[in-house]
UniProtKB/Swiss-Prot annotation:
Coiled-coil ranges (or none): 140-267
PANTHER family: BECLIN 1 (PTHR12768), BECLIN-1 (PTHR12768:SF6)
Segments of this protein annotated with the region Interaction with BCL2 and BCL2L1 isoform Bcl-X(L): 110-157
Predominant location: cytoplasm
Region of interest: Evolutionary conserved domain (ECD): 243-448
Modified residues (N-acetylmethionine): M1
Span list, region Disordered: 47-72
Subunit structure: A homodimeric form is proposed to exist; this metastable form readily transits to ATG14- or UVRAG-containing complexes with BECN1:UVRAG being more stable than BECN1:ATG14. Component of the PI3K (PI3KC3/PI3K-III/class III phosphatidylinositol 3-kinase) complex the core of which is composed of the catalytic subunit PIK3C3, the regulatory subunit PIK3R4 and BECN1 associating with additional regulatory/auxiliary subunits to form alternative complex forms.
Note: Expanded poly-Gln tracts inhibit ATXN3-BECN1 interaction, decrease BECN1 levels and impair starvation-induced autophagy.
Protein name: Beclin-1
Example of a GO cellular component annotation carried by this entry: nuclear body
Length: 448
C-alpha cells in the first residue's frame, strides 16, 4: 500500500498490483463489505468434504482448529482447506491510520475499512499461490493460465478414469496374460540391455578407431599441405625454367637463322663488290682509272688499288697459294708489293700524281708485278680446273691485257707512254678477271 497526503483534511490510500506494480483503483464494493460478504469470500474452496463421524469432532475438540479432511469421490482425491482467521485483532498485518481530519470518526472508519481490505487480500494470497491484489490485465492472464492448468488436470483425470475402468474390467485370466507379457517384456528388456551394452562396447572401440583414423587423417592432411606447397614451388620453378628454355630456344632459333643466312652469304662477294661505272671498273664503289673527261682523284685510285690487293691476298690465302717473286702487302690506300728476291725493294701501288708521276716508274713496276700475281693465281686454278678460263688473257712480260673476245686489241697496264683511256680499260679488264676468280673461289670453297 502507498499513501500520500492530498490536503490537510484528506488522506489518499492506494493499492498496487503484486505482479506489474501498477497502482490500483479498488471497486466501490470494497467500501461496503459486511461480515456476511467477508465470510463468503473467505469460505473454504471445497465445501462438500465430509469427515468421518467422530474423527472430525475429536480433532475439533483437541485442536480447536478447523479440520484438514481428505475425501474421495468418483475416484478423485479432494482435500478440505480451512479458511484463514480474518478477524483476529492480533494480526501482524493490521494497522491504524493516523492523520489530521476534521472528524475523528471518519478517520476511524477509513482505518477500519483499509484494515479489512488488507486482511481480505492477505487471506486470498494465503489460500492460493498468487499474491493479491491484481490488476485487470494480470487477472486475465492468470485466468488464462488457470484455464490451461484446469484443462490439463481434467485430461489427466479422464485418463485416470479410463485406466481405472480398464483395471476394474480386467479378470484374472487377463491379469495372468499381462504378467506373462510383463515377463516377456522384462526378458526382452534384458536382451536389449545386453545388446545395448554390446553396442556401447562396439561404440567405444569404434570411437577409439575413429580417433586413430582422425589422427591419421590429420597427419595426412598436413603431409598433403606440405606436398602441395612443395608442388607449388616446383611448379613455379618449372614455369621459370620453361620460360628460360623458351628464351634459349628462341635465341638458338634466331642464331640458327643467322647462321643459315651467313652460310648462304658469299663472304667475298659481300666484302668485295666489283662492278663498273661507265668506262671505269669499280671495287667497293672506288673507281680504278683516270680519264681526261673524268679526272678521278688519286686518293680514290689508291683506295681502289688497296681493295684490289686485299682481294687477291684473300683469294690466295683461301687457296693456300704462295706467290713467287712477290708478296702482297695490303695496306689500305698505301698498299704495296714486296720483292722476294730483293727484300729492300718495295713496289708501291699508290701514286700522288704531279711531274714525279711521269718520271717515276715504280708505280708501273708495281702494277706489272700485281698482274704477275694475278697470272699465278690463274695458273694455280687451272691446275685443278682445266676448264677454267679468264675472259681476258694477260701478257705479264709486256704488261698488257688482251681483249680476246672483243676488239682483239691489247691494253697496257702501265701509265708511261700510254693514254689514260687505254690504262683505264686495262684496269677494268683486270678487275673483271679478278671477279671471275672471286666467283670460282666462292663456288669451290663455299662450305670450307
Amino acid at each position: 500500500m502507498e499513501g500520500s497526503k492530498a490536503s490537510s483534511s484528506t488522506m489518499q490510500v492506494s493499492f498496487v498490483c503484486q505482479r506489474c506494480s501498477q497502482p490500483l483503483k479498488l471497486d466501490t464494493s470494497f467500501k461496503i463489505l459486511d461480515r456476511v460478504t467477508i465470510q463468503e469470500l473467505t469460505a473454504p474452496l471445497l465445501t462438500t468434504a465430509q469427515a468421518k463421524p467422530g474423527e472430525s469432532q475429536e480433532e475439533e475438540a483437541n485442536s480447536g482448529e478447523e479440520p484438514f479432511i481428505e475425501t474421495r469421490q468418483d475416484g478423485v482425491s479432494r482435500r478440505f482447506i480451512p479458511p484463514a482467521r480474518m478477524m483476529s485483532t492480533e494480526s501482524a498485518n493490521s494497522f491504524t491510520l493516523i492523520g489530521e481530519a476534521s472528524d475523528g470518526g471518519t478517520m476511524e472508519n477509513l482505518s477500519r475499512r483499509l484494515k479489512v481490505t488488507g486482511d481480505l487480500f492477505d487471506i486470498m494470497s494465503g489460500q492460493t499461490d498468487v499474491d493479491h491484489p491484481l490488476c485487470e490485465e494480470c487477472t486475465d492472464t492468470l485466468l488464462d493460465q488457470l484455464d490451461t492448468q484446469l484443462n490439463v488436470t481434467e485430461n489427466e483425470c479422464q485418463n485416470y478414469k479410463r485406466c481405472l475402468e480398464m483395471l476394474e474390467q480386467m479378470n484374472e485370466g487377463d491379469s495372468e496374460q499381462l504378467q506373462r507379457e510383463l515377463k516377456e517384456l522384462a526378458l526382452e528388456e534384458e536382451r536389449l540391455i545386453q545388446e545395448l551394452e554390446d553396442v556401447e562396447k562396439n561404440r567405444k572401440v569404434v570411437a577409439e578407431n575413429l580417433e586413430k583414423v582422425q589422427a591419421e587423417a590429420e597427419r595426412l592432411d598436413q603431409e598433403e599441405a606440405q606436398y602441395q606447397r612443395e608442388y607449388s614451388e616446383f611448379k613455379r620453378q618449372q614455369l621459370e625454367l620453361d620460360d628460360e628454355l623458351k628464351s634459349v630456344e628462341n635465341q638458338m632459333r634466331y642464331a640458327q637463322m643467322q647462321l643459315d643466312k651467313l652460310k648462304k652469304t658469299n663472304v667475298f662477294n659481300a666484302t668485295f663488290h666489283i662492278w663498273h661505272s661507265g668506262q671505269f671498273g669499280t671495287i667497293n664503289n672506288f673507281r680504278l682509272g683516270r680519264l681526261p673527261s673524268a679526272p678521278v682523284e688519286w686518293n680514290e685510285i689508291n683506295a681502289a688499288w688497296g681493295q684490289t690487293v686485299l682481294l687477291l691476298h684473300a683469294l690466295a690465302n683461301k687457296m693456300g697459294l704462295k706467290f713467287q717473286r712477290y708478296r702482297l702487302v695490303p695496306y689500305g690506300n698505301h698498299s704495296y708489293l714486296e720483292s722476294l728476291t730483293d727484300k729492300s725493294k718495295e713496289l708501291p701501288l699508290y701514286c700522288s700524281g704531279g711531274l714525279r708521276f711521269f718520271w717515276d716508274n715504280k708505280f708501273d713496276h708495281a702494277m706489272v708485278a700485281f698482274l704477275d700475281c694475278v697470272q699465278q693465281f690463274k695458273e694455280e686454278v687451272e691446275k685443278g680446273e682445266t676448264r677454267f678460263c679468264l675472259p681476258y688473257r694477260m701478257d705479264v712480260e709486256k704488261g698488257k691485257i688482251e681483249d680476246t673476245g672483243g676488239s682483239g686489241g691489247s691494253y697496257s697496264i702501265k701509265t708511261q707512254f700510254n693514254s689514260e683511256e687505254q690504262w683505264t680499260k686495262a684496269l677494268k679488264f683486270m678487275l673483271t678477271n679478278l671477279k671471275w676468280g672471286l666467283a670460282w673461289v666462292s663456288s669451290q670453297f663455299y662450305n670450307k
